[in-house]
From Swiss-Prot:
GO MF, one annotated term: translation release factor activity, codon specific
GO cellular component: cytoplasm
Annotated gene: prfB
Transmembrane segments: none
Localization annotation: Cytoplasm
UniProt KW keywords: Cytoplasm, Methylation, Protein biosynthesis
Cited SMART domains: PCRF
Main location class: cytoplasm
InterPro entries attached to this UniProt entry: PCRF (IPR005139), Pep_chain_release_fac_I (IPR000352), Pep_chain_release_fac_I_sf (IPR045853), PrfB (IPR004374)
Organism: Pectobacterium atrosepticum (strain SCRI 1043 / ATCC BAA-672)
NCBIfam families: prfB
The protein's name in its UniProt record: Peptide chain release factor 2
Post-translational modification: Methylated by PrmC. Methylation increases the termination efficiency of RF2.
Length: 365
């Protein structure tokens, strides 16, 4: 005879946690809103306003992720309770083991939804921009910046996010001086917001003929895309707009006209730039969107000084504000805020960042 009380206790625990989550996530209101959104998307003229239709589609995906999961949990707990009763009635150990396996699946699903409670910020659900900036140190630092770009692109791909490289300035010899990546998907900013800070690399440099150990720094700065209806006042007189040719390694796709755009907000010295389109007009629009987002984040940082990771703006990065150390010679990567550490350095550089990100979110950083 198998022991059923621990399984009953697990079912009860999952049911109680589901009920708490149902209330916290306002399930009833979200279910009602989902029905409204679905009805709007079924209207034949919805695509007459493409931006609104896209916004509704995105809202539907976000609502479904919560409503459908809670529905699946409720149905799953009902099914597993019936399965346990069947196992007891027939004294069937295989069915009993199946009950435990199903509970593992439900617990994992519930855990993922509970983790969403970490995303309570106003813009946690938004798309975001990630700026990577090489520190001083020449080619070694610029190579490190390009490694970070690759790492975050791999991470985003594994999470199912879409990415766009908005701007990338090549290094003098190798690597990247700076890059801006747009990350598109549910809770992109929520996932990445604790990655803002300085990343330190220690390794034997492939650019040093003597094979000596070098320490390099590059920074990451994450800020949410701001809705157009958020009122961010920008005085045109405060802007300096420069146009230039997009950089690149050559070939038929190199832009031969001055279509790349750089915008400097003079009062704050915040700079945005875009070169990913052949149209100067489109690049300017994108750079203005980034500027609006950066100014919003800048204001939020001033209002929430205790949570401020950066000082004033990205250009004033303090190289002491390190968040993570990557010591490749010793095969050790350590988060300096949470103490989370791993020796699988290649996996991290290939985008396996969740252990660090989840720990920082749970720590309330």
């Amino acid at each position: 005879m198998f022991e059923i009380n621990p399984v009953k206790n697990r079912i009860q625990d999952l049911a109680e946690r589901s009920a708490v989550l149902r209330g916290y996530l306002d399930y009833d209101a979200k279910k009602e809103r989902l029905e409204e959104v679905n009805a709007e998307l079924e209207q034949p003229d919805v695509w007459n306003e493409p931006e609104r239709a896209q916004a509704l589609g995105k809202e539907r995906s976000s609502l479904e992720a919560i409503v459908d999961t809670i529905d699946q949990l409720a149905q799953g707990l009902e099914d597993v309770t019936g399965l346990l009763e069947l196992a007891v009635e027939e004294d069937d150990e295989d069915t009993f083991n199946e009950t435990s396996a199903e509970l593992d699946v439900l617990e994992n699903k519930l855990g993922q939804l509970e983790f969403r409670r970490m995303f309570s910020g106003e813009y946690d659900s938004a798309d975001c921009y990630l700026d990577i900036q090489a520190g001083s140190g020449g080619t070694e630092a610029q190579d490190w910046a390009s490694m970070l770009v690759r790492m975050y692109l791999r991470w985003a791909e594994a999470k199912g996010f879409k990415t766009e490289i908005i701007e990338e300035s090549d290094g003098d010899v190798a690597g990247t001086k700076s890059a801006t990546i747009k990350i598109i998907g549910d809770y992109a900013f929520g996932w990445l917001r604790t990655e803002t800070g300085v990343h330190r690399l220690v390794r034997k440099s492939p650019f040093d003929s003597g094979g000596r150990r070098h320490t390099s720094f590059s920074s990451a700065f994450v800020y949410p895309e701001v809705d157009d209806d958020i009122d961010i006042e920008i005085n045109p007189a405060d802007l300096r707009i420069d146009v230039y040719r997009a950089s690149g390694a050559g070939g038929q796709h190199v832009n031969r006209t001055e279509s790349a755009v750089r915008i400097t907000h003079l009062p704050t010295n915040i700079v945005t730039q875009c070169q990913n389109d052949r149209s100067q007009h489109k690049n300017k629009d994108q750079a203005m969107k980034q500027l609006k987002a950066k100014l919003y984040e800048f204001e939020m940082q001033k209002k929430n000084a205790e949570k401020q990771v950066m000082e004033d703006n990205k250009s004033d990065i303090g190289w002491g504000s390190q968040i993570r150390s990557y010591v490749l010679d010793d095969s050790r990567i350590k988060d300096l805020r949470t103490g989370v550490e791993t020796r699988n350095t290649q996996a991290v550089l290939d985008g396996d960042l969740d252990k660090f990100i989840e720990a920082s979110l749970k720590a309330g950083l």
